[in-house]
């Protein structure tokens, strides 16, 4: 039961981080600006309708609705570097830890700040659960050092990492 709860929190946290950090480039200038996306609703539905557990996953993810929601939640993670994925895993673990402590998500601006500057040390069991679930759920590789390096070390250097970028008239 505790594992199901943590898996549900992983899916919710991953989708929240992706939704908050989704970016679009302004036309003609090539500068990325953060814009809130409606992926939060899609990912919430994914969490409620499509189980992230490996046993049920093979049957549930075959439904076209689940496939679409999975694509909208996981595609941005596949588009960033492996180093950025490692940091994203830590960010997801931090969000889960805050949820377990009863803290609210706050405003998107606050989440972006916590992405680059963690305020709490993430328990290793939460990080391990994210490392075991997120890569397989989204079919992405996570660098080996993510499994051995504490999140506080990985995220000490702030990175400006857009989880997804669509550029019109310029480059990001």
From Swiss-Prot:
A single GO molecular-function term is:
nutrient reservoir activity
Keywords assigned by UniProt, alphabetized: Disulfide bond, Seed storage protein, Signal, Storage protein
**The keyword Secreted is annotated on this UniProt entry:** no
> Can you summarize the PTM annotation of this record?
Contains 7 disulfide bonds.
CDD domains reported in the protein's UniProt record: AAI_SS
Disulfide linkage: none
Question: Signal peptide: which range, if any?
Answer: 1-19
Classification via Pfam families = Gliadin
Quick check: keyword Disulfide bond in the entry?
Answer: yes
Report the protein's function. Answer: Seed storage protein. Not integrated in the gluten polymer through disulfide bonds, unless incorporated by reduction and reoxidation during dough making. Increases dough strength and bread volume, but decreases dough stability when added into a base wheat flour.
Hey, which family's this protein in?
A: Belongs to the prolamin family.
**Record protein name field:** Avenin-like a4
């Amino acid at each position: 039961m505790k594992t199901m709860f943590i898996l549900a929190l992983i899916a919710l946290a991953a989708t929240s981080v992706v939704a908050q950090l989704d970016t679009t480039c302004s036309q003609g200038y090539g500068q990325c600006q953060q814009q809130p996306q409606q992926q939060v609703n899609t990912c919430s539905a994914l969490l409620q309708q499509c189980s992230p557990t490996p046993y049920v996953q093979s049957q549930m993810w075959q439904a076209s609705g689940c496939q679409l929601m999975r694509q909208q939640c996981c595609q941005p993670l596949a588009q960033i570097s492996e180093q950025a994925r490692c940091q994203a895993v830590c960010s997801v673990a931090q969000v889960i830890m805050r949820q377990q402590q009863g803290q609210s998500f706050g405003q998107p601006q606050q989440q972006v700040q916590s992405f680059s500057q963690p305020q709490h040390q993430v328990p290793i069991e939460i990080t391990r659960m994210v490392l075991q679930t997120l890569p397989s759920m989204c079919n992405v590789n996570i660098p080996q050092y993510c499994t051995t390096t504490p999140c506080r070390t990985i995220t000490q250097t702030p990175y400006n990492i857009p989880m997804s970028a669509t550029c019109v008239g310029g480059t990001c």
